[in-house]
Design a protein with these regions (language model features):
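Short, surface-exposed loop/turn motifs that are enriched in glycine and acidic residues
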Residues: 31-35, 51
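Short beta->alpha connector loops at strand-helix junctions that form conserved
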Residues: 29, 57, 82
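Short, surface-exposed connector motifs at secondary-structure boundaries
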Residues: 1, 24-25, 49
Length: 121
């Protein structure tokens, strides 16, 4: 099971529900030092903590991933949550919890440098 850091676009409720299922998940909103960090800083923090970063900010994190690759560096992994797959409606929180839980229940680990779009669970 891969440990995760949810960026500040996600509620601490999601992290709490996933922790209740036995997953190692932290939410940036729960740590005052993480709130308001620039995208490159939150990715660096997640990488230093060996946690894959979960974000819905696809347009900014794809270029950050490219910068890591160009520098021959690997982040701890990126899980991208597409608004097309997970619309921001009343089902969003439950759908993200379900999809992340299904992903984390798989025996394979998220690899350093890996980027994946979260599939709907």
């Amino acid at each position: 099971m891969s440990p995760l850091l949810l960026d500040e676009m996600f509620s601490g409720i999601i992290a709490g529900q996933l922790r209740a299922k036995g997953h190692h998940v932290l939410a940036a909103v729960a740590g005052p030092a993480l709130v308001g960090l620039a995208d490159d800083q939150i990715l660096a923090h997640a990488t230093a903590a060996r946690r894959a970063l979960v974000t819905a900010n696809v347009k900014d994190f794809i270029p950050l991933d490219a910068r890591y690759r160009a520098a021959s560096q690997a982040h701890a992994g990126l899980i991208l949550v597409s608004a097309k797959t997970f619309p921001q409606d009343r089902t969003f929180t439950a759908a993200v919890i379900s999809a992340l839980s299904a992903l984390l229940d798989q025996p394979s680990q998220i690899q350093p440098g890996q980027v994946l779009f979260l599939p709907r669970g």
